[in-house]
């Protein structure tokens, strides 16, 4: 009889354990990004993404979704251009009193970093350029990452770029949404205007159940440009062709939305501003 009771209780015990939700946390570890060329990185794991933040350059080398797909595809190999070394986020300072906040490639100048906050729901890492003129703050939350340019070199400008590969590689049937239009735009469709407030854009792959989004927390009247470079996206807040327009401290978000429906993406992005 005792044996019968024991066996009868096992399914109940298994069900209880299986249905117990696991806590959602933001965790920080350290390691190499092999896909980027063995670069030393902060590795930040959240419930929706894994971010590889390269320690010397101060930019992302990889952003993995929950299926392990990398939506950046950076590699430091010299000469790889759009197929590797140009990719990343935020890639913000280029020939503007230095070249900073880009995963380390042949043209990236070095920065130093410090972890300022490390809790279960918030990690903050601050990078300072070698010339002390630029400072960028990374804040990682359960559902997104915020990048804030907290210090701008006087008289210089920057942009915030997503140069990546939706769904792991660029395909002709990839697409994007934005705050300017609720209809999906083909990946070849360019954009050269100021996005309406709240300024956001999201990129998707028809085979993926999610999209990667970028959000500008402050509204402005500066251009936001997108063009398809065949091997990667080139989207920039404060960018038109090769001109930079941002010159004050501002905040931007990047992350995944587990949907490809416009209204759900719009709602998720707007919640990030609350």
Where are these regions (language model features)?
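Bacterial N-terminal signal peptides that target proteins for export
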Residues: 1-8
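C-terminal motif of bacterial Sec signal peptides marking the signal peptidase cleavage site
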Residues: 16-18
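Beta-strand-rich recognition/accessory modules
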Residues: 26-47, 56, 202-274
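Extended, loop-rich substrate-binding clefts of extracytoplasmic carbohydrate-active enzymes
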Residues: 86-143, 154-161
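Acidic (Asp/Glu-rich), glycine- and aromatic
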Residues: 141-181
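A recognition module on extended beta-rich or small alphabeta surfaces enriched in W/G with H and D/E
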Residues: 178-212
